[in-house]
Amino acid sequence: MAKAKSSVPAGHHTVTPHLIMNDASSALDWYGKALGAEILARAPGPDGKIMHAEIRVGSSIIMLNDEMGGGRSAKALGGSPASLWLYVDDCDALFKRAVAAGATVPPGPMGTPADQFWGDRCGGIVDPEGYTWTIATRKEDLTPAELDQRAQDFFKSFAASQK
């Protein structure tokens, strides 16, 4: 057995999301169909539950497994306080594909894709397991001064719309 060359496995980042699933096998299939995920690892236990799996979405790896050992899925908890942000070349196309595959669109301003003041176009989905994803495309690179001005303009407009 060779000693590890790095403390971070090849292809991983120093922070890697690890999602607990109600049905990891179905989630793996859905992430492939809806988000174009590539399955890198899939380790079912003797009972057929997924003990560990890894997928690549874009340039990032996400780990996942079925509920076990006290781990609870977003579905079991009624949602997740954490969300995932996915940058792609065409957020509108991937958004439509994910919705066609069974994602739901949350209510509010981060639902259907729209241009945002910080230079992204993005929209939100909730996957069948209950995890929220923002699907985004960077449209403009802003200077700090441009971003600050746009933020001020946005919040003034938002405050006026609430009266």
Q: What is each PLM-predicted segment?
A:
Residues A2-H18, L28-V126, I135-K163:
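Vicinal oxygen chelate
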Residues M21-S25:
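Short acidic-aromatic low-complexity motifs
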Residues E129:
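C-terminal catalytic core of tyrosine-transesterase DNA break-rejoin enzymes
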